[in-house]
Every structure is written in structure tokens, then in C-alpha cells.
Amino acid sequence: MGKIILTGDRPTGKLHLGHYIGSLQRRVQLQNAGDFDRMFVFMADVQALTDNADNPEKIRQNITEVALDYLSAGLDPQKCTLYIQSMIPELAELTTYLMNLISVSRVQRNPTVKTEIKMRNFEANIPLGFFCYPVSQAADITAFKATTVPAGEDQEPMLEVTRELVRRFNQTYAPVLVEPEILLPEIACCRRLPGTDGKEKMSKSLGNCIYMSDDEKTVWKKVKKMSNGEPRMSMEEPGHLEGNAVFTYLEAFSTPEYFAEFWPEFKTLDELKEQYVKGGIGDGTCKKFLNSVINKMLDPIRARRHEFEQDIPEVFNILKKGSEDAREFAAQTMDEVRKAMRIDYFSDAAYIEEQAAKFKI
């Protein structure tokens, strides 16, 4: 088995710049580099339903939005497999088997689960499906024998659960499943891009997102409201980088080429920072530059999205074909899993003969 990438997103809303810089941009780069044998990218609708069970229409509508975001960002169905999680029933079966290999207390210790439970106010009444989603996520990964999972650093505890389950399964039954490694964003600030308020992770529920599909006017409206950290009385005062969302975003998105085009007074972000902390550069000017950078980056993405929006049936054809291909792969893994667990009753001819001989008079 070769090198395989697997990654995905919950279809609970349009994808934003945090998704793009945190993993989506890297996925496109990895796809185009061709260093991996297979690449799977999926919409985790089953996982999304664990905390949206009473609102399936929300998930249904956002399948289309996320698919458009994937395709507009540059994911190519000729190079990677795009699929919908619920269309692969083998994942539910594997989840059940993996649940037998982990304790409730181990899941409870997962810091990501603790954070998610608190964020959703589930402390007093946790849906079982939500509580068990680390195991479901492990099934998502292992069913496709993924060797690499591009993700943010907040997902490392989840990957560790997967690795533990792989080791436990392979030791208990047979060496069938593969231990995955996480692939973090190369730029540290991209691993957890803050919201426009500078205080929290970018999140739709917090209203601090810039979406990949936002038009130019909407982007500028949001950039103008971004946090600059500690306030200044005038631009002549020294600027502060700590807690300054504008510079965090510039760290993530600016390049020397953008400086040459939009702010030739500076060649690099380091030069701008050096002058900013001395004073003499207004926050409004920095925001205008950031606005130009973001919109320049989003222009081709928005253009591709518009093209795909004109043929939504084809978008669903892509997802249907990808789901069929993904299911075929997962089914092969499950054949190996059942054989390892000795529950391949109908395909094990030797077992049937043995049982026949046992009861033969």
C-alpha cells in the first residue's frame, strides 16, 4: 500500500479563510505535487449530524456550499477523490468494531473532545454520537488506510486516538490497519487562524469569519472591523503586534509579490513590522493592504466558483462518482478487517468445510 492522504470538513457552513490557510490550500498543493498515490477528501456529514441532529436541512444545504468551495479552491476530481461520508456505510461498521477497543474514560480524556463539549454546552447532556466521534473519525481514516492527515494542531489528540486504535486492532487481530501521521501547516500562524476579532478561532457561530466566497465589498467590510490589538491614540505612536489580527493575517497571506504590487515601499512583511512598531504607519493603511492581499488571493477562487455554480448537477455527479470510488476502497479494507476478526463467515471456505465436518454424521 502506498502513501495516502485523507482529510475532510464538516458541512455546517461555507468554508472560510481559516479552512483555506489551515488545510485546503495545502491539500491543493499536495494534490498537484503528485507525491501521494491516492488522495481522499470528504464531507463529514455524519459527524456534522452529531450536534445538528434536529436540523439535517442545514447539513443538506451546506453539502453544495462545501463542494463548491472544494472545487473553487482547486481540488481536482481527476487527481483526488471527493466524497460524502454518509455514502460509505462501511464506515459505520468499522466504527462499531473500533468502539470495542477503547474505553469511555479514554475518550473523556481527549482535550479536543473536552473543548468541543464545553463549546456546545453539552456538559450536562452529551449526545452519544457526538461523544463517540473520535472513534468515528478513526474509522474515517483507517478505512482508507491513510498514511497522512493534513490538519490543524488542535486535531493532534484525535490522531493519537486513531493511532492507539490501530495498534490495538493490529495487536488483537492482524496487522491490517495503518497508523497515520498528521501534517501540520508549514506556517505556525496558519495552524489556528484567529477570527477577525483576534480573540478566537475563526468560527461561523462567533461571527468572525471571512468566507472564501465573500465578494470584495464584504471582505473590505470585515477587514475594516478587524482588531488591531492594543489601541493607539495616533499613528505616530508605536504599533503593537501582539493580539493584532491584521498582522496575523498578513503573516498568513502576504508575499513579497503582494508588497511589490500593493505597497512597494516595503519588500517584505518583516520590513513593515519593523516600521510599524516604531510608529508612523496607520492601522487603516495596513488594513487596506490586507484587503488588497485577500481579494487578490480570492479573485481566481471566486471566478472558479462562479463557473461551477452554473452546473450544479455536474457538481453532484462528481460527488456521486467520488463516493462510489471511495466505497469500493473502503469495502476492500472491510473485507480484510472481517477476515482478521474471523467474522468473514460466508467467504471463508475452509471455515465452512470445518463446520460441515464437525456436524457430519
List each model region and its residues:
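N-terminal Rossmann-like or analogous alpha/beta NTP/dinucleotide-binding catalytic cores
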Residues: 2-139, 257, 296-298, 302, ...
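A short secondary-structure junction signal
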Residues: 109-110, 146, 174, 205
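Short coil/turn segments at secondary-structure junctions
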Residues: 11, 50, 54, 149, ...
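Conserved nucleotide- and phosphate/pyrophosphate-binding catalytic cores
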Residues: 163-361
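Structured ligand/cofactor/substrate-binding pocket environments in proteins
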Residues: 15-24, 39-40, 45, 54-59, ...
